[in-house]
Regions:
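Periplasmic-binding protein-like
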Residues: 191-200, 206, 241-265
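A ligand-binding cleft/hinge motif common to bilobed small-molecule-binding domains
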Residues: 78-81, 224-243
């Protein structure tokens, strides 16, 4: 009996050791419905998939250490400083056989975030713009940030509901550009000018959130939001009967950003992390995600597999004219990060 019991313990111990796992921390509403399940079935790896809705939340976990995740997806502007802080380990590109599918033009745009792509692979990219209900919002208003930042215009939409991203860096950069200041400024007086403008429109904002607006726009609970391109298009795709939503890039310009897959330095399942990244780099997998979340992927080999309605829309896959209206999301200096958070919080609490 004792011999049987010992054998059973050994078997249980071996089974526990043999269990293949992977822990992923990604943005909410940012993957196709079957991506994880398909990966698990093919590789026999159990995936724990958690979500966040702000770079600040992710960064706090990473800098504290011991996050428990094997793959995380920070925006490139945050990734830059996280690399400097030693948060990530270098990728083993010998394990990424599909890396050649990446578009050289996209790689050039993200070079500043991670020179040579030593630590990260671009997952998806997009822009920050205006999400709106086509029946409740005047189409003449959606071409400019004035729809959110001019109180005379924003007040028209107070009753049908305005939401704002809970994203200090992006909101403050866009607000600074709107008032004619450098979006990358470290001059506190410039932030005071932007705050004065934001305080004028604060009474008309129903809430600040970086994911709730998707369902609310789709269900008609709000009619206007600052939002991320794919999230707004997802709301449009899932809109309830009688609700139509769409996305606009304002004429004053906006941020283009790139979200990056990276492996934390203390990740426990590094081999499986590389398997997942390489899986995402398959053309069909990348296209399936884009077709579901409506965000651009960097996989050139996937272009022909992306729904033409998505691939041919310059608000999703920017053409040269659209690119000329965009400015890069860059890494914050400690001072800029502090100013962005300080003045954004003043805006929220006003």
């Amino acid at each position: 009996m004792l011999k049987y019991f010992i054998s059973l313990l050994v078997l249980i111990s071996f089974s526990a050791q043999a269990k293949e796992e992977l822990f992923i921390y990604n943005w909410s509403d940012y993957i196709a419905e079957d991506t994880i399940e398909n990966f698990e079935n093919e590789f026999g790896i159990d995936v724990t998939y958690d979500v966040f809705d702000s770079n600040e939340v992710l960064e706090a976990k990473l800098l504290a250490g011991g996050s428990g995740y094997d793959i995380v997806v920070p925006s490139g502007s945050f990734l830059e400083n996280q690399i400097k802080a030693g948060v990530f380990q270098k990728l083993d590109k010998s394990k990424l056989s599909n890396i050649g599918n990446l578009d050289p033009d996209v790689l050039a745009k993200i070079e500043a975030h991670d020179p040579g792509g030593q630590y990260s692979i671009n997952y998806m990219y997009g822009t920050t713009g205006i999400g709106y209900n086509t029946d409740k919002v005047d189409e003449n208003d959606i071409t400019s940030w004035s729809i959110l930042f001019d109180p005379a215009i924003a007040s028209k939409y107070e009753d049908c509901g305005i939401a704002m991203l809970d994203a200090p860096t992006e909101v403050m950069e866009i607000a600074l550009k709107y008032v004619g200041k450098d979006p990358y400024t470290e001059d506190e007086k410039d932030y005071e000018v932007a705050l004065a403008m934001l305080q004028e429109i604060r009474p008309y904002i129903r809430y600040f959130d970086s994911s709730q607006y998707i369902d609310d726009l789709a269900n008609g609970e709000i009619c206007l939001t600052m939002g991320w391109s794919g999230d707004v298009f997802l709301a449009a795709d899932e809109a309830a009967d009688g609700v139509e939503a769409w996305y606009s890039i304002p004429s004053e310009g906006t941020v283009i950003w790139f979200d990056m897959m990276a492996i934390p330095a203390d990740a426990k399942n590094v081999e499986n992390a590389h398997k997942f990244i390489n899986y995402i780099l398959r053309p069909q997998v990348a296209a399936d995600i884009t077709n579901y979340v409506w965000y651009s992927n960097p996989n050139k080999a996937a272009n022909e597999l992306v729904d033409p309605e998505i691939f041919e829309d310059p608000a999703i896959y920017p053409d040269e004219a659209t690119l000329s209206m965009l400015f890069a999301d860059t890494a914050d200096s400690p001072k800029k990060a502090q100013l962005s958070t300080k003045y954004f919080n003043k805006f929220k609490s006003n």
